[in-house]
C-alpha cells in the first residue's frame, strides 16, 4: 500500500504531462490551418498522366487549341514531364522526362481539371525550357520566356472570373534549341469552415 501511495503522485504528474501535450497539439494544427498551408490542395501534380499533346513545327498555328470545345480526340495521351533526356539542365533525364518532346518544335498540351466551387487562389506552377503560353479555359493567363534551365518560371494565379467546376489547362511550349522540358502542377486553397 505504501508503494502505491508513492507512485500515485508520479502517475498524476505523468497524466498531467500527457494531457498538456494533447492540448498543445491541436493549437499547432490550428495555427497551421490558419496560415493556409494545411489547406493547399493539389488538383494536378507534376508528372501527372492524362495529358493530350501534339508536337508541331515552330511556326505552325493551331487555332483554338486552348479552347474548351477543341477536339483533341485524335491526339496521343502522355505523362508530364515532356522533354528531352540529352540536355544540359538537371531535369533533362530519364527520371523526370516521361514523354518525349523533340528539339526545335513546339508542343501543345491539354488537361482537364475538376475543382470544387469554393476553390480559391487556383495557381499554376511549373518549368519550361524555353518558353510557354499558359491558358486556362481558353484565356491566356501567362506568357513565359524562361530561357535555358530556369526552373519555376511558370507561376500564375488564375483570375476568379476564369474558374469553373470543369476546367481546361492548355499550354503551348516553345523550344529554342538544344533541349526541351515542360512540367507543371495546379493547386488551390480550400477555405476553412467557420465554427
Model segments located where?
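Secretory targeting and sorting signals
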Residues: 1-31
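Accessory carbohydrate-binding/adhesion or oligomerization-edge regions at the termini
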Residues: 14, 27-90, 111-114, 127, ...
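Extracellular beta-rich ligand/substrate-recognition surface
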Residues: 91-107, 143-150
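Extended extracellular/luminal ectodomain segments enriched in beta-structured repeat modules
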Residues: 104-107, 115-123
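Short proline/glycine-enriched turn/loop motifs at strand-loop junctions of beta-rich domains
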Residues: 119, 127-132
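Solvent-exposed loop/turn segments at secondary-structure junctions
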Residues: 129-131, 147-149, 175-177
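Short, surface-exposed beta-strand/strand-loop-strand elements in extracellular ectodomains
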Residues: 131-141
Amino acid at each position: 500500500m505504501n508503494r502505491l501511495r508513492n507512485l500515485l503522485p508520479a502517475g498524476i504528474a505523468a497524466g498531467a504531462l500527457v494531457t498538456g501535450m494533447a492540448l498543445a497539439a491541436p493549437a499547432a494544427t490550428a495555427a497551421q490551418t490558419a496560415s493556409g498551408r494545411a489547406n493547399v490542395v493539389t488538383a494536378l501534380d507534376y508528372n501527372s498522366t492524362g495529358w493530350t499533346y501534339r508536337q508541331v513545327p515552330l511556326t505552325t498555328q493551331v487555332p483554338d487549341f486552348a479552347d474548351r470545345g477543341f477536339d483533341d480526340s485524335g491526339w496521343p495521351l502522355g505523362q508530364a514531364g515532356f522533354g528531352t533526356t540529352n540536355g544540359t539542365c538537371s531535369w533533362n533525364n530519364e527520371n523526370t522526362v516521361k514523354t518525349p518532346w523533340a528539339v526545335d518544335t513546339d508542343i501543345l498540351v491539354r488537361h482537364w481539371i475538376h475543382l470544387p466551387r469554393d476553390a480559391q487562389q487556383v495557381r499554376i506552377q511549373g518549368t519550361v525550357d524555353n518558353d510557354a503560353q499558359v491558358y486556362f479555359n481558353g484565356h491566356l493567363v501567362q506568357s513565359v520566356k524562361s530561357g535555358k534551365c530556369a526552373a519555376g518560371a511558370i507561376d500564375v494565379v488564375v483570375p476568379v472570373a476564369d474558374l469553373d467546376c470543369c476546367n481546361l489547362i492548355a499550354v503551348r511550349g516553345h523550344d529554342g534549341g538544344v533541349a526541351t522540358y515542360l512540367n507543371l502542377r495546379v493547386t488551390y486553397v480550400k477555405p476553412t469552415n467557420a465554427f
